[in-house]
Amino acid sequence: MNNDNIDRVLIAGAGPTGMVAARFLAGAGIPVTVVEASNELQKDLRASTFHPPTLEMIDQFGAAQHCIDAGLTCPLWQFRDRKQGAVATFDLGLLADITPYPYRVQCEQWRLNQYLREQLKEFPHAEIHYGVSSVSVTQDADKVALTVADDKDEQVLEGRYLIGSDGAGSAVRKSLGIEFEGMTIPEKYLTLSTPFDFQQAMPDLADVAYLSDPEEWVVLLRTKSVWRVLFPTHNQSDEEITDSALIESRLQSVIPRDEPYEVCLLYTSDAADE
């Protein structure tokens, strides 16, 4: 890793926050080094919605159009009752006079990250290192020193500033003694993807719908190729949550059908991960 430029900005974490920050800095001619604990950019089912203000921001380097092309534009979103149907439908198209993006874009955030990585390759003063975890940080009046570790040893990187975007369990935040007050809701979620078209069974269903129910709420979210379904879980282990028979039963409770549902991807997450 290049450690000979004290004026560089260090970024811990190559999620969308870290990658967008890196792109802005590199575009402004500022040297930047990103370190990411994973061996590759994450490619999972995390957040997949880009709202108008975010699209306006990332449009500065062409990323908004990339997300639009790779995703699905959704001007409508809904609150529904699982038994009674639509309760309220909101139309972002009403914002057309104040934003060039009067809609949500449903596009997996990893697609944005990959696009930004390709852009960062065009800047010789920008670098990304994978399999490198942030351990601790110190600072003085002139610089910041970030201790990082890979599978072999530790190294100290120095820079003018450090951006800590290394997640809910941030080593940067903990190292600086910055409190993270509040609580984590003790809830785990099941998120899955299916090619089944829920709008065929519910013609008035918006592309994004939050279904309320006293027993089990559900989120239905359409992407360009599949529907994502988010369920709460009930004090179960991951093995129980991901049991194929239970998943089939839960999907059948949303829309009963004769054929079994095809599930192409699923994962569980805690509230702190969302």
Q: Predicted segments — roles?
A:
Residues 4-15:
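Beta1/beta-strand and adjacent pyrophosphate-binding region of the FAD-binding site
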Residues 26-45:
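Glycine-rich FAD pyrophosphate-binding loop
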Residues 40-56:
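Conserved N-terminal glycine-rich FAD pyrophosphate-binding loop of Rossmann-like flavoproteins
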Residues 51-115, 119:
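Active-site-adjacent segment of FAD-dependent monooxygenases/related oxidoreductases
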Residues 130-143:
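A conserved short coil-to-beta-strand element within the FAD-binding core of flavoproteins
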Residues 153-161:
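Core beta-strand elements of the Rossmann-like FAD/NAD(P) dinucleotide-binding domain
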Residues 267-274:
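Conserved small/polar residues in nucleotide/adenosyl-binding loops
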